[in-house]
Amino acid sequence: MAKDIKFSEDARSLMLQGVDKLANAVKITLGPKGRNVVLEKKFGSPLITNDGVTIAKEIELENPYENMGAKLVAEVASKTNEIAGDGTTTATVLAQAIIREGLKNVTAGANPVGIRKGIDKAVAAALTELHTISRPVSNKDEIAQVAAISAADDEVGQLIAEAMERVGNDGVITIEESKGFTTELDVVEGMQFDRGYASHYMVTDTDKMEAVLDNPYILITDKKITNIQEVLPLLEQVVQQGRPLLIIAEDVEGEALATLVVNKLRGTFNAVAVKAPGFGDRRKAMLEDIAILTGGQVITEELGLDLKSADISSLGRAAKVVVTKDNTTIVEGVGGADAIEARIGQIRAQLAETTSEFDKEKLQERLAKLAGGVAVIKVGAATETELKERKLRIEDALNSTRAAVEEGIVSGGGTALLNVYAAVEKVSESEEGDVATGVKIVLRALEEPVRQIANNAGLEGSIIVDRLKREEIGIGFNAATGEWVNMMEAGVVDPAKVTRSALQNAASVAALFLTTEAVVADIPEPAGAGMPDMSGMGGMPGMM
């Protein structure tokens, strides 16, 4: 396909139009008084949202040059979302500001490479200062504040804070859609995996259709059990102790399963069989996790162990096990604290090394089951449209909270970016030429989030920015109440990681944009020609 090439000013101005179209659609959502954007969906109801990255991903422009500009800024939002999980609108606003200011200078004759150096130096100084002024999250109230600011909802803030308190920082918090109108928190204590009983005859509570085992022994193996003779010596030892047994195996079937069911129905012996969770190497790792948590041992041929020679000392133990049709939950395993901590350290090391998102998710789940627990926030709403919007906001709030726990918090409402203004200004004083110009471009961009938050609140942004520069560090404008307050004390805070990622990613893409000198795009194909004239064929009169 033939290509169209545009150079220098022509290329950059068309791409800038795309940047502006996307950024202008996204930035109206910024701040406590930001508006929503409605996104058309081919199927189902439209999506109403104020989530920057969701809006950015939906925008496709007809002009290929404008579309390239828009996609570059969408990349800023997407990367910020990937790293910090929130702050995508702030990142978009910063990118637009750096690009616009930078292009003015490039058009006036400045060298884009020098400007890029200045931008990099300014951002490095800003990030160092951000790290200095951030402080760690110290209590549940601060976690609630971060979540409430992100979701613009105090109730959501409290729910997320409670979830994090109950499952710990390593716990897994998932967000699901509820069938009701209210948003609720459901916490699963202990280790849960998604495998249920092998036979419904094993249930002990017929009303709830679940098997509850108090103080059971737990047999953990990666073998398939079909012959009861394989486990008979072990079963006899457990029967002598008068305690129930949970069997976790690759499968329990045939004669072995029938014998367990018959003994359960006769009241001779209470045993519940479940399939081992996961597949392949992940199954081995999860069985090892269960063994460490319960103080048992995985009976596997890889370790030279078999079921016939195993004795009661190889079995794990727990205070309680609850097995439903779909899930098994082990509560209060008796595994040693040192062994569990060592295993947690091992999983954390694997988490740090892996690059696969899927592997990260599975490792995080395993970590949560060992270290904390699993909390589920069930989101309720009156309509499907409201449910989707609310779920997106809660996901952002949860990501914000995790980011705050990781790297601490700074003053919110764009105040932190102006608090680093003086540190960046010092860099501009020590530089000259185009490098100094690059630093000044970042200085101007640091004002933009505060300006936009004020504009969205119906105020004159420039007046707010000017006053904020004169205020002492920590004092900011609370757009929700229209008051000048100490932002930390008022609970208007942002995660330092979110602010850092937004600035870093915006500057990275904007600097690349400014050094662009040529843009190549496909030439659109002309509309297809109509059918040829078929009149008079075969001696017939022409078609009318």
UniProtKB/Swiss-Prot annotation:
The keyword Nucleotide-binding applies. It catalyses: ATP + H2O + a folded polypeptide = ADP + phosphate + an unfolded polypeptide. It holds the Pfam family Cpn60_TCP1. InterPro entries: Chaperonin_Cpn60_CS (IPR018370), Cpn60/GroEL (IPR001844), Cpn60/GroEL/TCP-1 (IPR002423), GroEL-like_apical_dom_sf (IPR027409), GROEL-like_equatorial_sf (IPR027413), TCP-1-like_intermed_sf (IPR027410). It is an enzyme of class 5 (isomerase). It is found in: Cytoplasm. Keywords: ATP-binding, Chaperone, Cytoplasm, Isomerase, Nucleotide-binding. Its EC number is 5.6.1.7. Gene3D superfamilies: GroEL, GroEL-like equatorial domain, TCP-1-like chaperonin intermediate domain. ATP binds at residues 29-32, 86-90, 413, 478-480, 494. One of its GO terms (molecular function) is isomerase activity. One of its GO terms (biological process) is protein refolding. Signal peptide: none annotated. Its main location: cytoplasm. One of its GO terms (cellular component) is cytoplasm. Together with its co-chaperonin GroES, plays an essential role in assisting protein folding. The GroEL-GroES system forms a nano-cage that allows encapsulation of the non-native substrate proteins and provides a physical environment optimized to promote and accelerate protein folding. Forms a cylinder of 14 subunits composed of two heptameric rings stacked back-to-back. Interacts with the co-chaperonin GroES. Belongs to the chaperonin (HSP60) family. This is Chaperonin GroEL. The lineage of its organism: Bacteria, Bacillati, Bacillota, Bacilli, Bacillales.
